[in-house]
Amino acid sequence: MNPLIIKLGGVLLDSEEALERLFTALVNYRESHQRPLVIVHGGGCVVDELMKGLNLPVKKKDGLRVTPADQIGIITGALAGTANKTLLAWAKKHHIASVGLFLGDGDSVNVTQLNEALGHVGLAQPGSPKLINMLLENGFLPVVSSIGVTDDGQLMNVNADQAATALAATLGADLILLSDVSGILDGKGQRIAEMTASKAEQLIDQGIITDGMIVKVNAALDAARALGRPVDIASWRHAEQLPALFNGTPIGTRILA
């Protein structure tokens, strides 16, 4: 069975209750299903907290964090360090054998600089599946941060949705984007069960989908096109529904290519 990538986002890393629910769902799923799982995570809330403590400005452009050269070390420490190891600690607590990685390990995801204006922000492209497939074959849960490295050794901060998309293409995996929201909402705050590219463009033009959600929707659309299969956007808040989601039952918004 092809692997499933679960991309974690939002304030999940700040909530012990959410992490407990998520890892309980992961344990239950792994006990009853053989499907290999991979976690990809960002950690914007961890970065924001650290930047605030250091009195450093947080600047975003089109939903992407501007990352100057003097901040990439701090952001790497927050994402590949604190956020990644927090998730590994929760996996350990729940007796799940896990391995912490970043995108550059085993050249799993290739990264180039997105553009000069954003600084150390990377564009993710599919890489080599060898390392992660080896870990999956041996029963490990890879936990991958959204920090990458260019061919000339420059660390890059990669949007975690886009990192997960590139890794899904690398592994031929299905993809779920878990966030704070239960899916994409229409103008009345109602969840949209299915979303096509034309519907997404319409809602962006109307100002209903904005900021970071535009990046999330575009990443999901890119993933659906690249993978040739639907991608789910859903919430981690409903833990009891997560095993069904991991098994292919939509509970949020299903993005169609």
Swiss-Prot record:
Reaction catalysis annotation: N-acetyl-L-glutamate + ATP = N-acetyl-L-glutamyl 5-phosphate + ADP
Site note Transition state stabilizer, residues: 7, 216
GO molecular function: acetylglutamate kinase activity; ATP binding
Keywords: Amino-acid biosynthesis, Arginine biosynthesis, ATP-binding, Cytoplasm, Kinase, Nucleotide-binding, Transferase
Compartments where located: Cytoplasm
Keyword Transcription carried by entry: no
Function of the molecule: Catalyzes the ATP-dependent phosphorylation of N-acetyl-L-glutamate.
InterPro entries xrefs: AceGlu_kinase-like_sf (IPR036393), AcgluKinase_fam (IPR004662), ArgB (IPR037528), Asp/Glu/Uridylate_kinase (IPR001048), NAGK-NC (IPR041731)
Protein residues bound to substrate: 43-44, 65, 157
GO cellular component annotations of the record: cytoplasm
Superkingdom in the source lineage: Bacteria
The gene coding this protein: argB
Primary site of residence: cytoplasm
Family according to the record: Belongs to the acetylglutamate kinase family. ArgB subfamily.
Pfam family, one: AA_kinase
Cystine pairings recorded for this chain: none
Residues annotated to bind ATP: 180-185, 208-210
Protein name, as recorded: Acetylglutamate kinase
Organism the protein comes from: Salmonella paratyphi B (strain ATCC BAA-1250 / SPB7)
Subunit organization: Homodimer.
